[in-house]
Every structure is written in structure tokens, then in C-alpha cells.
């Protein structure tokens, strides 16, 4: 099976980078501030979910989010991701995390080999497997963030079905999906994480 070949012959390499930063909401935007001393962007220690502190003067980056535009019955608000971060005027220092993962390093040579042999099936299958492996890596890394790197759910013990049902604490939105439809925020995230330098990842034109 191709999945066995990927593993035994080392066709693909996986890499990931994660960052956790102080943050506050300003309207529909989220301001990110430099991490305090000892809390590097590729965090290895637990950080508080929220702590009383005066907002930092330096804004490192801004994430721009869009508010829902749906017609809803009275009493049902249109949400924005910024609603889930403490407002700057609250005086509460909140935090935000992000990560980028890939399981496709090394794939180009094998795709080219299949396409040169007019083996479209194997080319498509390899791309699909790399995509699924990246999704699995994202799931595993998100769990490690919750339990270890950020540590806000250190005692979490979810079974596979609970993970599928997203029964964990927190959310994992991604640019290009309904909660964050603006693809341009990928550039901001890649810059924050230095995804090219830390994980060998690059954004495509699409």
C-alpha cells in the first residue's frame, strides 16, 4: 500500500510550528503583542489563559476578522472571532495561539515521477494521503497545545469520537473557512510563525 511506502521509504516529511502570544480585541480585530521574556513564540511552557495586566504599548501584528452577515432572529448575534478575545479596554491580558503544519515536504519529486509515467491515479492518491496526514498532524499538535504547550487543558482525556465532535475546549479556525474566510490572513500567520524558516512551508498563489 502507498501509505506503507511513504513510511518505509521516507517519501514525505512532516513539520510544524506553533506560537502563543498576548492578545486583545479591538473591534473586529485582534492585536498581538510580543511574548513576555521566557515565553518564546514557539512556546514550550504553559501560559495562562488570561491574566490581569495593562495592555502592551507595542502592537506586533493585527489579525483582521469578519463578522457574520447572516439574518438571524432577535437575540441571536452575528459573531466574530474577535468576540472570543478579551477587549483591550477590559484591562485583561488574553492570549491567542496559532500553528502551521505540513506533511508534504518531499512530495514534489514523487508527484513528478508519477506524472512522467502518466500515472495520474498514484499522483492523486499521494496528494490525498499527504493532505490527510497534515490533518492528522494538526489534530495531534492541537491536542499537545491544549495539554502541554499552552497547558489550559492539562487534564484533558478525550476519546477519538469526542475529538471528532470537537469536544475540546477552544476553537481551531483556519483562514479560508467560514469563521475566517479571508485567505490573506495566511500571510500574517506565516510571518508570525516564520513558517518558511521554521517548517519549510510556503504559500502558493492559490
Language model feature labels by segment:
Residues 1-124, 128, 146-149, 158-160, ...:
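Active-site loops and adjacent core secondary-structure elements that bind or stabilize anionic groups
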Residues 134-147:
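Charged, low-complexity helical/coil segments in non-catalytic cytosolic or luminal regions
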Residues 114-118, 139, 153-206:
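Activity-critical C-terminal alpha-helical subdomain
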